[in-house]
Amino acid sequence: MDHNVRETVTRGLSEYINGPQVPNSGDELTFYITHEVIREFSPRLMLVNFWHMDVAHRGTYSLYLQAITRMDRLTGMLWDTVQENPNYLDKATVPILPEMGRDWDANASNGYLHHRSGDASCRNMWMLALGAGVTAGETERPVEHVDVAATALRLLGSSGSGMKGRALSEILI
């Protein structure tokens, strides 16, 4: 690992552990590290994976609601972090989407780790895109996961030729 990256991650961990707020999830650690990396390096492309929503698999609805509230707060803070960075001003696009929907599983056997896939709703997912390069509105056509990748490539200036996915041109400026 590059020395500067190691130093940034170490500083983020230290602030996370010793900070004035008591962190209550690994997603908060993810946010703190992300905040430091954005502040220090302003990467052109970054993937942030908040994972605590998987608490839903435990079957405790109150924990799931807490995770949703936390996710809303951290996502808002992430957007604020992006907006405060002069390197991203009027340039950054932030797509927000769940980790995945589900592909069809003919067995419909309640799947691996309770990821049911026999239900059509398991194949639906949403995406929110904020910032430069996107416009307000909704996409009414059926969209596949590969379309999200094609859209990201278009935002990065690549045509994505040869890809199965089709960019969501209706949301792109």
What residue spans do the PLM features occupy?
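Metal-dependent active-site segment of extracytoplasmic phospho-/sulfohydrolases and closely related
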Residues: R70-L113, A152
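Loop/turn elements at helix/coil->beta-strand transitions in domains of secreted/extracellular proteins
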Residues: F41-M46, N87-T93, A132-G133
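Polar, surface-exposed loop/tail segments
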Residues: D147, L156-I173
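Substrate-binding rim/cap in mid-to-C-terminal beta-strand-loop elements of soluble/periplasmic
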Residues: R116-L156
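Active-site-proximal alpha/beta segments of enzymes that process anionic O-linked groups
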Residues: M1-V37, L168-E170
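Solvent-exposed loop/turn segments at secondary-structure junctions
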Residues: H52-A56, E99-D103, G133-T135
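Structural recognition of the beta-strand scaffold that forms the well-ordered cores
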Residues: L45-N49, T93-I96, W126-A129, T151
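Active-site His/acidic residue clusters
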Residues: F31-M77
